[in-house]
């Protein structure tokens, strides 16, 4: 099974994968942890979108079809898990281009943050999997505040894809911890 103690891995970093519903506080928690543990690096799944030309036809209806999880695993997550430096180029959807290379030194804590961070393609490169959730009403409130006028499109497109991914791969059920942030305010 996946049971493993930190003491069993003295030469490798702790890799904490934070997945969960949009608006549940994944990025906020990752940022808080990074501040609390300066000897850490944070990898964002949002840095690994596929350029539109590389996406499969009908990607809008297929969970995770807009993500380059192979590249995330091979260029960033696996080296970080092995205690090696990481170098990768994030893809910016806003700019429609890859950004300059990011270089991250090996650290004892690696925070993998974002939707799809518990995807089966990434299994084996994490130590601890945490799923964040919140009540639907709270998710709506948070997303409206975050997305503003883009909320309707966001809710119609991304929320169903995410929920499909959770159901298909039993993401909450296979997490080591499930954290409900409904009462957490802005976490």
Give the ranges of each region predicted by the language model.
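ATP-dependent NMP and nucleoside kinases share a basic, alpha-helical "lid"
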Residues: 97-146
């Amino acid at each position: 099974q996946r049971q493993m103690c930190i003491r069993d891995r003295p030469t490798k970093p702790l890799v904490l994968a934070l997945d969960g519903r949009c608006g549940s506080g994944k990025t906020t928690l990752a940022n808080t942890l990074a501040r609390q543990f300066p000897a850490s690096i944070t990898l964002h799944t949002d840095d690994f979108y596929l350029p539109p030309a590389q996406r499969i036809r009908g990607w809008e209806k297929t969970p995770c079809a807009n993500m380059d999880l192979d590249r995330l695993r091979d260029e960033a997550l696996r080296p970080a898990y092995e205690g090696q430096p990481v170098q990768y180029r994030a893809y910016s959807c806003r700019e429609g281009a890859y950004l300059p290379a990011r270089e991250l030194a090996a650290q004892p804590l690696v925070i993998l943050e974002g939707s799809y961070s518990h995807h089966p393609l990434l299994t084996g490169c994490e130590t601890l999997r945490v799923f964040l959730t919140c009540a639907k009403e709270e998710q709506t409130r948070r997303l409206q505040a975050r997305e503003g006028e883009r909320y309707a499109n966001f809710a119609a497109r991304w929320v169903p894809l995410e929920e499909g991914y959770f159901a298909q791969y039993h993401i909450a059920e296979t997490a080591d911890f499930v954290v409900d942030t409904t009462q957490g305010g802005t976490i």
